[in-house]
């Protein structure tokens, strides 16, 4: 599939490209004059199940052909490579273990935090553990940091982090999800080093934002038939600006920082990154140049004045870009929902990209009034799902005195008596509600129910 080369093979796709479509079109174009089975020998590793489904849907749209193997990064450990690696410990079990350790620490140092913050601290520490495992950072590396702190906060922080040391010393025997994923990638890289695959292996759509993913990308890029396809690569960024991204203190928040780190690890220059091939149009190309210039790191912001006036067709570059100043969060969500509704009416594909989960819930609620159910890639929290809400109502019966309001909220829930005789159940519920509203106190007792049932 790929011509021989003496350097790692890395491709990029610019912002504005339909990444799954460009990936599929590029694979088909590169196998146009080859035997049908050659495409089936290609392995494509992607980030998410959503990406895998979209790629399969694009292939299924035709023409008929043998498809490549499409794998999700998190599924790499399901094969022979992960056979000797212990299964991951459930996240809930790990959080409960951490809550016990934090509880013991709070007993020894009660001024560290209140007992009410126990589970919040457990969640925070578990998230930190996941990131440390993913990046390959041990508690010892954090303790060795030279942080000038006269107030003692850093010492207390190190004490807090030290309680998870045992999960790093014995991480391979009872690994969490991130640790197991890193072990799988390490084993896979070692296997490829001694038995390199002859067929093409492609990692597509990954940015290397996680340390484990970066390990996999480096291992694949060094294969004779391996390749990386980077999304949102900035082909307009000058090479002298790329060199200023080496300092993490100044540039770690830049969207191209991880790509710079990857290029340094592979010994590549920006000019070595080839365009996989995608027609993004003149307006999108102009917008990319504008965005690239606006995101220059601090030492190069003077380029705004030097290069800004030379940008062609600013009006075309910003066509379709709207700035909305919302007075309230509700107005913000409604504006987004109205635009998504318009896209649905026009038959367009639209996406809301935001880290704000409250905003997504407000937008979902606004769309619900038009019977539009968006596909949320982050999923729905269990406690907000219909079964979760029902179980929360049931749990309230054990934690507080039963009121008529709580009782009927539970009885009228769609999951309460959801069988074929639900109509009869709702009739009984209505009769009971009318009886209790007329004759019983706000907190009914067993005798009140017996009196109603005897009628």
Question: Each PLM stretch: what is its role?
Answer:
Residues 1-455:
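Polyanion-engaging groove/track-forming segments
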């Amino acid at each position: 599939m790929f011509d021989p080369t003496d350097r790692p093979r890395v491709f990029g796709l610019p912002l504005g490209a339909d990444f799954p479509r460009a990936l599929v079109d590029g694979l088909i174009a590169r196998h146009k004059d080859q035997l049908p089975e050659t495409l089936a020998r290609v392995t494509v590793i992607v980030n998410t199940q959503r990406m895998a489904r979209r790629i399969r849907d694009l292939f299924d749209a035709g023409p008929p052909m043998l498809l490549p193997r499409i794998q999700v990064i998190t599924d790499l450990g399901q094969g022979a490579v992960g056979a000797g690696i212990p299964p991951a410990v459930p996240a809930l079990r790990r959080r409960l273990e951490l809550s016990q350790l934090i509880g013991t620490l709070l007993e020894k140092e009660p001024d560290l935090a209140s007992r009410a913050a126990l589970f919040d601290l457990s969640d925070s520490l578990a998230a930190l553990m996941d990131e440390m495992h993913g990046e390959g950072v041990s508690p010892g590396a954090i303790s060795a940091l030279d942080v000038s702190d006269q107030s003692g906060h850093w010492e207390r922080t190190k004490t807090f982090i030290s309680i998870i040391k045992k999960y790093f010393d014995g991480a391979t025997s009872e690994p969490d999800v991130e640790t197991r994923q890193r072990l799988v990638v390490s084993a896979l890289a070692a296997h490829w080093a001694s038995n390199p695959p002859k067929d093409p292996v492609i990692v597509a759509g990954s940015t290397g934002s996680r340390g484990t993913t970066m390990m996999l990308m480096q291992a694949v890029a060094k294969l004779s038939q391996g390749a990386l396809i980077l999304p949102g690569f900035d082909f307009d960024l000058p090479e002298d600006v790329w060199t200023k991204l080496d300092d993490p203190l100044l540039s770690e928040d830049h969207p191209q920082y991880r790509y710079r780190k990857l290029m340094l690890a592979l010994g590549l220059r920006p000019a070595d990154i080839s365009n996989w091939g995608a027609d993004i149009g003149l307006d999108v190309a102009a917008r990319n140049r504008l965005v690239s210039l606006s995101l220059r790191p601090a030492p190069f912001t003077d380029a705004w004045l030097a290069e800004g006036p030379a940008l062609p067709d600013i009006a075309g570059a910003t066509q379709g870009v709207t700035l909305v100043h919302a007075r309230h969060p509700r107005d913000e969500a409604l504006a987004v929902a109205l635009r998504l509704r318009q896209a649905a009416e026009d038959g367009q594909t639209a996406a809301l990209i935001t880290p704000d989960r409250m905003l997504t819930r407000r937008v979902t609620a606004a769309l619900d009034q038009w019977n539009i159910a968006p596909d949320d890639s982050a999923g729905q929290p269990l406690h907000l799902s219909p079964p979760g809400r029902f179980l929360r109502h049931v749990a309230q019966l054990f934690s507080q005195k039963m009121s008529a309001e709580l009782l009927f909220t539970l009885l009228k829930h769609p999951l309460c008596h959801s069988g074929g005789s639900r109509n009869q159940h709702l009739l009984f519920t209505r009769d009971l509600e009318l009886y209790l509203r007329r004759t019983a106190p706000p907190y009914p007792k067993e005798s009140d129910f017996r009196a109603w049932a005897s009628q």
